[in-house]
């Protein structure tokens, strides 16, 4: 008996030592990827340009197309996904062998899980090439199996198969810093993408949110002014699932304010009743309500970095082609982003604060003194770029004003 216990103790000690060595080899004391989660307006511009050039609504079934994606855009997307879904950081770079993804995940005890995975050029769906986890080399086939298992576990196996059949080739060009994807378009791709993006229960929530908005505006005179604070207070605090139902309401309200047909996302919405048009305003301005709600919806559904990047991109674009850069609009964007982020991360606390009296001034601090209407030349003269000290100083002032509002503390 004693000999058996002795061998058991030795075996357990061996397992513990082996596990400790494996942990030390697979983890690092320093992160492989260190960066912020910010997304640049350039990335938004690149994504919009690619979508415009390869609009799925204009593609024919069986059409062969090539899309050249900037490596920097894939890099930003990798970091965004790593931050949003893994609470880590990510990077993508072009190498002599193809492309390489790098992921860092923080672990307890000030250790980091650092993964490198190379992707060589391929005909069809690419396979993982060289890979390392910390100091440990990993067989690419092992990661391929892990990805396949994750796809099955997520319930998107059929969508993955459709994408695999559509993908014809993947090539990398270090000179132009682009990744070329050759694909065969099939209408099922768009249909399945919609199904993955919005589950049946989310579509049901969107339907209920649309009906609630229809009922709220039914007794209003068409074109009558309605404050955004009144709408939010009437639709959000009564929800049993504030995060999910709140996201649905923000998306419905954003599509209404932006005059975007919700059927583009949910085909069934073509048969839903439409809300009566009223003039929704924030601080007396309809455009500020638009900025606030669209940014809130983006933050609630996609995260704060995406909402911030799109808001800044729009203002820079307005400076070049539209009504001019407006820091007042930017303040409304940031207020909406904070609202949507709070709904996604701290819904109970936000709803509790909405339950009392709510005014527009609780949503947006005074901003009438901020500069607006700056064309491209005026913006360059005063601020040069969003990276300049004058711009950052004014942006910090906006954040300080938002910090002073109890709703965003």
Identify the role of each PLM range:
Residues 63-65, 132-133, 279-288, 321-326:
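Second-shell loop/turn segments in exported
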Residues 342-409:
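Primarily interfacial, aromatic-capped hydrophobic alpha-helices that serve as membrane anchors
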Residues 2-222, 334:
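Extracellular/lumenal and peripheral-membrane lipid-interaction modules
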């Amino acid at each position: 008996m004693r000999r058996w216990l002795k061998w058991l103790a030795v075996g357990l000690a061996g397992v513990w030592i082996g596990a400790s060595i494996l942990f030390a080899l697979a983890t690092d004391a320093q992160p492989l990827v260190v960066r912020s989660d910010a997304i640049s307006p350039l990335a938004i511009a690149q994504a919009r340009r690619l979508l415009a050039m390869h609009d799925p609504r204009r593609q024919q079934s069986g059409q062969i197309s090539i899309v050249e994606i900037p490596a920097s855009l894939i890099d930003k997307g990798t970091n965004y996904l790593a931050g949003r879904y893994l609470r880590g950081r990510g990077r993508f770079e072009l190498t002599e062998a193809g492309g390489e993804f790098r992921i860092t995940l923080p672990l307890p005890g000030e250790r980091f899980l650092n993964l490198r995975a190379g992707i060589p050029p391929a005909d069809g769906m690419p396979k993982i090439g060289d890979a390392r986890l910390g100091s440990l080399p990993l067989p690419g086939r092992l990661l391929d199996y892990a990805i396949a298992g994750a796809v099955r576990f997520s319930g998107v196996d059929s969508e993955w198969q459709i994408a695999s059949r559509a993908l014809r080739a993947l090539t990398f060009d270090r000179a132009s810093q682009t990744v070329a994807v050759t694909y065969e378009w099939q209408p099922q791709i768009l249909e399945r993408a919609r199904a993955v993006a919005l589950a049946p229960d989310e579509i049901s929530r969107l339907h209920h949110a649309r009906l609630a908005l229809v009922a709220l505006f039914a007794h209003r005179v068409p074109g009558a002014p309605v404050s955004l604070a009144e709408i939010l207070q009437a639709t959000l605090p009564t929800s049993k699932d504030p995060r999910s139902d709140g996201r649905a309401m923000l998306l419905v309200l954003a599509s209404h304010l932006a005059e975007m047909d919700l059927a583009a996302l949910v085909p069934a919405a073509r048969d839903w009743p439409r809300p009566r048009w009223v003039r929704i305003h924030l601080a007396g301005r309809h455009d500020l309500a638009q900025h606030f709600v669209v940014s809130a919806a983006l933050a609630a559904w996609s995260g704060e970095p995406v909402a911030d990047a799109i808001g800044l991109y729009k203002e820079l674009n307005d400076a070049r082609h539209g009504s001019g850069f407006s820091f007042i609009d930017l303040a409304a964007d940031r207020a909406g982003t904070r609202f949507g982020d709070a709904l996604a991360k701290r819904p109970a606390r936000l709803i509790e604060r909405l339950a009392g009296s709510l005014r527009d001034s609780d949503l947006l601090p005074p901003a009438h003194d901020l500069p607006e209407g700056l064309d491209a030349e005026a913006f360059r003269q005063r601020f040069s770029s969003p990276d300049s000290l004058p711009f950052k100083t004014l942006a910090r002032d906006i954040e300080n004003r938002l910090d002073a509002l109890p709703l965003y503390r």
